[in-house]
Structures are given as structure tokens and as C-alpha cells.
């Protein structure tokens, strides 16, 4: 009593305290960072190693395996996967959430150092690592184009100047440069000229290497001066290499230009990048796992003017893709929904109270509670994201409930003629415990969520804490500011009512009268209502089992990614043509804004594309509808497939795949894996629940297998090393020397001129100089025949692995796809040596599915414990919790009606309903218990009176919560797919709960009261017998 009076009788202090809370919230709002979702990125580190010319199997056994054994000992590694392709190995380490990325990086470097002695000696550089997830979509893509500069020169500017500077920006984890390679001097050899001049490839290589050296020359010094010695020992350009003497043939000098074409070109000619049909260099920027995407993008944009000044004016640098505009638009939509919710809630209050002064009270209480929450969010290190703003939108209906309960009860006393200050004090004292019970039991719902681990726990922690803080502030406001404003603003006698007020009042009285009559009938047919309650419990179970489920709603971020997979024996020239064809098809789609892509590198038969769609206001289709439309057109392209997927804000795992979801096959028997993977992939591709089924197992690449005749080699004076060196010199784009420049180092690359390697007959022209200096044709000691070889070798841990990726057709949920895969694997009879499991997002979905029911039950148990402690009763909490089945049925039926799968967002909606719908029961039970204790009423009369007295506040609070969630349910625009499931769940649950709990709660109350009396009667004879003894 003294607590309430302290604020009611000191209005100035109460007002100033509320203003202070609001100002702190405004300051917190201005300081809060902006993000699409809470920080849920797993710490990921990528280790890269190269050995030019080495086959995928050689890279896997000699490079990947030693590194994996060393890296596998690092603590906190969640998953380790590797991909070895021609000349390169990439290992992805995914760590637990609790691992600091910098500490993990130090452990990774130590593991690389430990494995160094086990790696091949011919590696041009030590393995390196990057703190970025290569499977994440870039947060920004920059393109460089020019009509005057070559692709190699553009790549040089991009990698030497731009990428280095951008990588130093805070928040940037990795900058990949694609579309070409660094400038180089290329020596294209003529095999016939070499044979005619009697010059071997090794001779040319040695001559070039010896002619271009960089060694210290020292200095000459006398008593007065010191001269630094400098020589022309380095050759920089193709023109300087052409006159180089590589051999003497019968005393005549053989120059390099006599046996080769020397050009200023690039290190690897098998790379291509394009943007909107124009050759381009791409800078793909990815953020650090812990970095804020909006802040990082803003820093990059701020640096772009300075970056443009560092490159020539003839180079055009453009932003081809930027993730931030759709994120900002989505957050603006949520903020708009929040404002609409506040307006609707206040409108509900006005319609019920029919007083401008009375409406002003919740109109002040709601903003104070919501704005004050921003201060707590800042102190907790949260961000303004879709989920935290959705929490505040939903909180609108909650925070007004507390004010409504207090305001309505005070208004009732005022209408009875009690003086304002006394009415405020008396009214808040009566409902203080009710408000406390409602708030604490609602916060209790989120305790299991706060303790939940893994990605779901991390994802919804900000949501739960934000909502809990808003409820906590609302609790304090409703017990302090609200009664103070009621005492000083409201009048003891209501003013003369207008015609509209009279009409609304008559409507409410009519509803209340109808409810009284129907409630009387229900109480006389309690068994029927009990059967209805049991039916809703059974219906909940059936609906939950049958409803389609997914991990997270499919987002439309306005960005698509595409992976090209062509025939495994395709040439680079043909692959570049496929890239151009695919880009032409996509550019013609009316929903597409721009498209960039690249191909080449270690895997010639693959490529990547990044597509920006037009803003939602300029297109009528969703991202998935655009993909469905393009899929039909892209399927007509022979010899290659392009798999498109919408970029999501959440992507789990470090695997780079050509679809959104993955199923991984593991085996210690590589032969068994290669035998069963095609069978499994073909079976899954036939399933109607899956789309775009593809695999990273590529073991059917074209290979020319050379078999050496070692006896002939010994007789001819040739070693295996000589023969292998010949092949590497001729066909491996061998880097034979280094050109040192002030800003970078460039290579001299040697290979046989591509004009002479158009078919396998090029091998007939190859020869080796034997120990006597005679040219020996390769065909004299080797035979060759076509064969198949893997283009890549994949590991997970230390086991051979193959990942089958898939997308979902429109209208199919992840649970339906997962069930279909599980059934197919069982029917195929896959041997135990080949193990299958979901990976990435699909794996987290499976884990979440197993914990959903436990989480809901834990929330119910927590609420029961809190209510039991508050009421000092085992029974009354059960009465209150009897409201939940009807809400669950309403929520699940609403999801079915809107064809929305049950996702994590819908799960949060169910948990919110646990907190919302029990408020009705709390208000009924509180007044019934008070009436029984003070009015000497029977249980039936007490609950009947409580239901009628609390009918208006119950209707007000329910409608306030419903209208608070309504903007989410009918949301459109950017990010609507995230908001809609939450709104649908809450609105559906509230409607069904309101229809049923007004009748089931009093029936359950009377049922438990009869049980209490029965046990009391049984206990009395026992007590009497004990006393007589």
C-alpha cells in the first residue's frame, strides 16, 4: 500500500522518473547498431594450400590429410571439411559458438606450423588461412571494367591496391578477386621448333630461370665514398625475354623468340569474369563472423571515393551487389508495423473506455515501456534487427495489458463514486498481484529459451530478453505511472456521455448479457465442455504431428546465387560460353536488375553467378517465383546446369554447394562411396519433394593415362623425373621465375603454345633430352589411353565424403523433404560402410525438431512453477494453464489455413501464446478467489461473478494483443515472410482461445474446486480418528 501511495501522491517525481527512462531509451536507440538478425554466425576459418599441377588425389593425400590430422586436434571444432582439386586444397573449420575467432585463428596457425614438415617440398608457399565463411554470400560485390585496360591489368589493380585496402576495413573478413589472374610473362613454346633446334623444355626453363635472378651485389667503398652495386640481372617484360639465348645449335645462338612466343599476359588464362555481358573483374567481399553487416557495408561505402582516386580514370568501378538496402527496407517495414500496432492498441483502449483522458494513460504508458527497452538492449549489446523489433511489436499488446487491468479497475471504482486518488490507490492495490502474476508468468515462458543452446538459442535470445525487459518496465509503469495518472487525470463522476459512447456501452452490455446467459448454460453442461477441452488437447497433438515444418521462413532478400555445373570433361573455352549463355537468359528476365559471374581456376567445369533482383516495389514475383520461372528456361541449355537459390540471412555450415540444403555421405571406403553416391543421387533426384539435386562428387573427368615403360627408359637414359618434368613444363602452366615489382611479385609462366595442344596428338610431339643429350620422343617410352579421374576429392573429418545438395520446390516444406530422403535411404539398402546424415541448415533443423516439444513442455512447466509459487497452490496453476490447448489449436489451424509451415518463428508464436492466453484465466481466478474469501460466495457464484466483472478487461486485453499482432500477420514488403508466421500464430491462437477459454476456464475452476472439497472431506475423518487415539 505504501509503495503505491509513494508514486500516486508524488506526481512530479513519478513523471520525472518516467521522462528519465524515456530519455535513456532514446539515447540507446540512437546508439544501437542495425542488423538483419541477431549475431548467429558460427566462427569459420578457411585454410588454403596450393601445389600447381598436382592432381586432386595427390592434393588430398599429400596436402589435405596431413593438415587435417593437425587441425583436427584443435579444441572446439564443430566440423572440418575439405575439398581438393587440381593444384589446390581448401579446408573449412567450423567452430562452436563459444570459440573466439581470434583465439581459434592462433590455434589454426599453430596447427599449420606443426604440419609443415609433412607437406610436399615443392609447394610454392605455406598454407594460409582466412577468417571468413566461403559459403556465405558476399555482403558486397564490386566490379572493374575498362575499354583500355586488359583483364590482367584490372586484376592487378583489384588485388594489389583495392583488395588490400578493403581487407583492412574493420569487419571485412575476406576479399576474393575473380575474373582473371595477375599479370605475367607467358612463354608459349613451339614443340616442332624446339625439336628442330635440339632444345629441351628443361633447357628453356633453366635458361629463363638463370637469366632472371635477384641477388644482392654488395657495395664498393673507399676512404671517402661508398657505391652500391646494381646490375640488370632482372628481366621485367616480354620484350626483354625474347632475345634471351637459351641454347647453341652447332655454334649458332638459339634465341627464345626462335622457339616460343613471348607475351605480356596473365598467370592463368583459364579465368573469366563478367557483369551484364561485359568482361569484368569481381571483388567479392565477405564479413568476419562476428561483424555487423550494415556497419561493415557503410565503412566500405565510405572508403569507395578514396579507392576510386587510387585507380586510373579509365577504370570504371561499380557496386554490382549490396546486401544492405533490403536489410534497411525490411527494418523500416518492421518499424512501421510497430507504429501501426501502437496506434491500433490505443484505438482499442479508446473504443472500450470512451474517454480521451482515460485513453491518454495507456497512450503514455506504452511508449515509455517500449522506448525504455532500447536502453536495456544497448546495455546488453543487442542490435536493432527484425527479431528484436518484432519483439517490441508483439510487446505492444502485452505492455498495454498491464495498464488496461489497472486502469479498468480504477475506472470501475470511479464510476462507483470513489474519489480519484482513493480510487487509484484502492484499484491498483486490488489488481497489483494480478498484474504481477501476469507479468512474471509471461517472462517465465522465455526462461527455457534463454537457457537453450545452439543456433536457435542464440538466434532468439535477443527476442526473449527484449520482450522480457519490455514486460518488466511495463509492470513497473502499470503500478506507478498508470495509477498516478488515473488519480490526477480521471474524474470521480463521468461526464455526460455522447451518443457514440452510449452506443458502444450498449454493445458491451449486450455482449456481456449474452455471455452471462451462455456461461450459465455451459456451467450446467460442464461434462460437454470437459470433452471439448480433451478434444482440443488431442487435436493439438495431431496437428503438430501432421503440419509441415521448416527451419526458418524462406526469405526474399532480393539476391540470388547460382552455381554452374557442366560436363566434367568440358574445356575452359566451352565453359566460358556456357557462362555467357546463362547470363543472357537471366538478364532477359524482367525481375532481374543485374547479374555478375565468373568461371575458371582449379575447377574448370564450374562457375558462380550473383544476381540482384529489382526492389519488391518494381516486381510482382517473389525470389522463389523468379527461380521457378528461370529454372524452366535454364534447363534448355545442353551440357551444363545452373542451380539458383535465394540468398538467406542465415546459412549454416562452411560447405560451398549449389543448393540451399545438404545431405552428406561419409565412408572410410572410397570405392564404396563412389559406387553408392550416384545411386543415391539418382534416387533422390526422382523425388517430387526435392529440386535441383546435385552432388560435389566429380569422379568422371576426362584423363589421359600415361604408362611408362621403365625398361625402355633405363635403356634410353631417361628418368621418371625427366618425363614428369617434361609434362609439367609443357602442360602445367609452370611458374618458372619471379618478377619483382615495387607493389607486387609477378610470374614467368611456361607451357606449350595452346595452338599445338588442341588434341591428344600433342603428346606425339613431346620429347626428352636423355643423358647423352639426344632428343627422345615421349612415344618411345610411354603409352597413353583415355581414362576417368576425379576433378575433386572431398573429406569430412578424416573420412571420404560426398555432399548431395538440394532445393525445395514451391509448396514443399523441409520436413517433407527430410522424411522423403530418410525413406529413400532406407529403401535403397545402403550398406553400413556408407553413412548418410543431414548437414548445414538441414542438420540444425533436425536437431531443432527434436527439441521443440521439450522446449514447449519446459515453458509450460516453468509457468506452472511460477504460478504455483505465486498462488501457493498446486491446483490453481492447472486451471490457468487449461487455456493453452485452445490457443495451440487456433495457432496450428491458422498456419494450415495460410499454408505456412511450422518454423522457428511459429514456435516463438506458440510460446508467446502460452504467456498471453493465460492472462484471461489469471484475471478470472484472482477475482473468484478474492470473492470466495471476502464475500462468502460459493465457488460457482464466485467464478460466475468473476467472469462477468472481468469480461470487459478480458476483451480489451485480448483485442489489444490481437491488434498488436495484426500488422505482422498482414505484413507485406521487405522481410514480410519473417513477420507473417508470428502474426498468424498469435492471431489464430488468440481468436480460438477467446472463443473457448471464457467457458472452459470456469468449468475447470469448478472441477478442481470439487476435487479439493472431496479430498478435504476424506481428510477430516482421518484427522478425527487420530485425535481420538
Swiss-Prot record:
The chain crosses the membrane at residues 15-35, 333-353, 360-380, 387-407, 431-451, 469-489, 528-548, 853-873, 897-917, 953-973, 984-1004. It is found in: Cell inner membrane. One of its GO terms (cellular component) is plasma membrane. It is a multi-pass membrane protein. The gene is mdtC. This is Multidrug resistance protein MdtC. The keyword Cell membrane applies. Part of a tripartite efflux system composed of MdtA, MdtB and MdtC. MdtC forms a heteromultimer with MdtB. It comes from Cronobacter sakazakii (strain ATCC BAA-894). Keywords: Cell inner membrane, Cell membrane, Membrane, Transmembrane, Transmembrane helix, Transport. GO terms for molecular function: xenobiotic transmembrane transporter activity.
Amino acid at each position: 500500500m505504501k509503495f503505491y501511495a509513494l508514486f500516486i501522491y508524488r506526481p512530479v517525481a513519478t513523471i520525472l522518473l518516467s521522462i528519465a527512462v524515456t530519455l535513456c531509451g532514446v539515447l540507446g536507440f540512437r546508439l544501437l547498431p542495425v542488423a538483419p538478425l541477431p549475431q548467429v554466425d558460427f566462427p569459420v576459418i578457411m585454410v588454403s594450400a596450393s601445389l600447381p599441377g598436382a592432381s586432386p588425389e595427390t592434393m588430398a593425400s599429400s596436402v589435405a590429410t596431413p593438415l587435417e590430422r593437425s587441425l583436427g586436434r584443435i579444441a572446439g571444432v564443430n566440423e572440418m571439411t575439405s575439398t581438393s582439386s587440381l593444384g589446390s586444397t581448401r579446408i573449412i573449420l567450423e567452430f562452436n559458438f563459444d570459440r573466439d575467432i581470434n583465439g581459434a585463428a592462433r590455434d589454426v596457425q599453430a596447427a599449420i606450423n606443426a604440419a609443415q614438415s609433412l607437406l610436399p617440398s615443392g609447394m610454392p608457399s605455406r598454407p594460409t588461412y582466412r577468417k571468413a565463411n566461403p559459403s556465405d554470400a558476399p555482403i558486397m560485390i564490386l566490379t572493374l571494367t575498362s575499354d583500355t585496360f586488359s583483364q590482367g591489368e584490372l586484376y592487378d589493380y583489384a588485388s594489389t591496391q583495392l583488395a588490400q585496402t578493403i581487407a583492412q576495413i574493420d569487419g571485412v573478413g575476406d576479399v576474393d578477386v575473380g575474373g582473371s589472374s595477375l599479370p605475367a610473362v607467358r612463354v608459349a613454346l613451339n614443340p616442332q621448333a624446339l625439336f628442330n633446334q635440339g632444345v629441351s623444355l628443361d633447357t628453356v626453363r633453366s635458361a629463363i630461370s638463370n637469366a632472371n635472378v635477384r641477388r644482392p651485389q654488395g657495395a664498393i667503398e673507399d676512404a671517402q665514398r661508398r657505391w652500391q652495386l646494381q646490375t640488370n640481372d632482372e628481366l621485367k617484360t616480354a620484350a626483354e625475354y625474347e632475345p634471351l639465348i637459351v641454347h647453341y645449335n652447332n655454334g649458332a645462338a638459339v634465341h627464345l623468340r626462335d622457339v616460343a612466343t613471348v607475351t605480356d599476359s596473365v598467370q592463368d588464362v583459364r579465368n573469366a569474369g563478367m557483369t551484364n555481358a561485359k568482361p569484368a573483374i569481381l571483388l567479392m567481399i565477405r564479413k568476419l563472423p562476428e561483424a555487423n553487416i550494415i556497419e561493415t557495408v557503410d565503412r566500405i561505402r565510405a572508403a569507395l571515393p578514396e579507392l576510386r582516386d587510387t585507380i586510373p580514370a579509365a577504370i570504371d568501378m561499380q557496386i554490382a551487389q549490396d546486401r544492405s538496402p533490403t536489410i534497411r527496407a525490411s527494418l523500416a517495414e518492421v518499424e512501421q508495423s510497430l507504429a501501426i500496432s501502437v496506434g491500433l492498441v490505443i484505438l482499442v483502449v479508446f473504443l472500450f473506455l470512451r474517454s480521451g483522458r482515460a485513453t491518454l494513460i495507456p497512450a503514455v504508458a506504452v511508449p515509455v515501456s517500449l522506448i525504455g527497452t532500447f536502453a536495456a538492449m544497448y546495455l546488453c549489446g543487442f542490435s536493432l534487427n527484425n527479431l528484436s523489433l518484432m519483439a517490441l511489436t508483439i510487446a505492444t499488446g502485452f505492455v498495454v495489458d498491464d495498464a488496461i487491468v489497472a486502469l479498468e479497475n480504477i475506472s470501475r471504482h470511479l464510476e462507483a463514486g470513489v474519489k480519484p486518488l482513493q480510487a487509484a490507490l484502492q484499484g491498483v492495490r486490488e489488481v497489483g498481484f494480478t498484474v504481477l502474476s501476469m507479468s512474471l508468468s509471461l517472462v517465465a515462458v522465455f526462461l527455457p529459451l534463454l537457457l537453450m543452446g545452439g543456433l536457435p538459442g542464440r538466434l532468439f535470445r535477443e527476442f526473449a530478453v527484449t520482450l522480457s525487459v519490455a514486460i518488466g518496465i511495463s509492470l513497473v509503469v502499470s503500478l506507478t505511472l498508470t495509477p498516478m495518472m488515473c488519480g490526477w487525470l480521471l474524474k470521480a463522476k463521468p461526464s455526460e456521455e455522447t451518443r457514440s459512447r452510449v452506443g458502444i456501452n450498449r454493445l458491451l452490455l449486450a455482449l456481456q448479457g449474452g455471455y452471462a446467459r451462455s456461461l450459465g448454460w455451459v456451467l450446467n453442461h460442464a461434462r460437454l465442455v470437459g470433452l471439448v477441452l480433451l478434444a482440443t488437447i488431442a487435436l493439438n497433438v495431431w496437428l503438430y504431428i501432421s503440419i509441415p515444418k521448416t527451419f526458418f521462413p524462406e526469405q526474399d532478400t532480393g539476391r540470388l546465387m547460382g552455381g554452374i555445373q557442366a560436363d566434367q570433361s568440358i574445356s575452359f573455352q566451352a565453359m566460358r560460353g556456357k557462362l555467357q549463355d546463362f547470363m543472357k537468359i537471366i538478364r532477359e528476365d524482367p525481375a532481374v536488375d543485374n547479374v555478375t559471374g565468373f568461371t575458371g581456376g582449379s575447377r574448370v567445369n564450374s562457375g558462380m553467378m550473383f544476381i540482384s533482383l529489382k526492389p519488391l516495389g518494381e516486381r510482382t514475383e517473389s525470389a522463389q517465383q523468379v527461380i521457378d520461372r528461370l529454372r524452366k528456361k535454364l534447363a534448355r541449355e545442353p551440357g551444363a546446369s545452373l542451380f539458383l537459390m535465394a540468398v538467406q540471412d542465415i546459412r549454416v555450415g562452411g560447405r560451398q554447394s549449389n543448393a540451399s540444403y545438404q545431405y552428406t555421405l561419409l565412408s572410410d571406403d572410397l570405392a564404396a562411396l563412389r559406387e553408392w553416391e550416384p545411386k543415391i543421387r539418382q534416387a533422390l533426384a526422382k523425388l517430387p519433394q526435392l529440386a535441383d539435386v546435385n552432388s560435389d562428387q566429380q569422379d568422371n573427368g576426362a584423363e589421359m593415362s600415361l604408362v611408362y615403360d621403365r625398361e625402355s627408359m633405363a635403356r634410353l637414359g631417361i628418368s621418371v623425373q625427366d618425363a614428369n618434368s617434361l609434362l609439367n613444363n609443357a602442360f602445367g602452366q609452370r611458374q618458372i621465375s619471379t618478377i619483382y615489382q615495387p607493389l607486387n611479385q609477378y610470374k614467368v609462366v611456361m607451357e606449350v603454345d595452346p595452338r599445338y595442344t588442341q588434341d591428344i596428338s600433342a603428346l606425339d610431339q613431346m620429347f626428352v633430352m636423355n643423358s647423352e643429350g639426344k632428343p627422345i620422343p615421349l612415344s618411345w617410352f610411354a603409352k597413353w589411353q583415355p581414362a576417368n579421374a576425379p576433378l575433386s576429392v572431398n573429406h569430412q573429418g578424416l573420412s571420404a565424403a560426398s555432399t548431395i545438395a538440394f532445393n525445395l520446390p514451391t509448396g514443399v516444406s523441409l520436413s517433407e523433404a527430410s522424411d522423403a530422403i530418410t525413406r529413400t535411404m532406407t529403401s535403397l539398402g545402403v550398406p553400413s560402410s556408407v553413412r548418410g546424415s543431414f548437414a548445414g541448415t538441414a542438420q540444425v533443423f533436425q536437431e531443432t525438431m527434436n527439441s521443440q516439444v521439450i522446449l514447449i513442455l519446459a515453458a509450460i512447466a516453468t509457468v506452472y512453477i511460477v504460478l504455483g509459487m505465486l498462488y501457493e497452490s498446486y491446483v490453481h496453476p492447472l486451471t490457468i494453464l487449461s487455456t493453452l490447448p485452445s490457443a495451440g489449436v487456433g495457432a496450428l489451424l491458422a498456419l494450415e489455413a495460410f499454408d505456412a509451415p511450422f518454423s522457428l518463428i511459429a514456435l516463438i508464436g506458440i510460446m508467446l501464446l502460452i504467456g498471453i492466453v493465460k492472462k484471461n484465466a489469471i484475471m478470472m481466478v484472482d477475482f473468484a478467489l478474492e470473492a470466495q474469501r471476502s464475500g462468502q460466495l460459493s465457488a460457482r457464484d464466485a467464478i460466475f461473478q468473476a467472469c462477468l466483472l472481468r469480461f470487459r478487461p478480458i476483451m480489451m486485453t485480448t483485442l489489444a494483443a490481437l491488434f498488436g499482432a495484426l500488422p505482422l500477420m498482414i505484413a507485406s514488403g521487405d522481410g514480410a515472410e519473417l513477420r507473417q508466421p508470428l502474426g498468424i500464430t498469435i492471431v489464430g491462437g488468440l481468436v480460438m482461445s477467446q472463443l473457448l477459454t471464457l467457458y472452459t476456464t470456469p468449468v475447470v475452476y469448478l472441477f478442481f474446486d470439487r476435487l479439493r472439497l472431496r479430498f478435504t472431506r476424506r481428510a477430516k475423518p482421518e484427522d478425527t480418528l487420530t485425535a481420538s487415539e
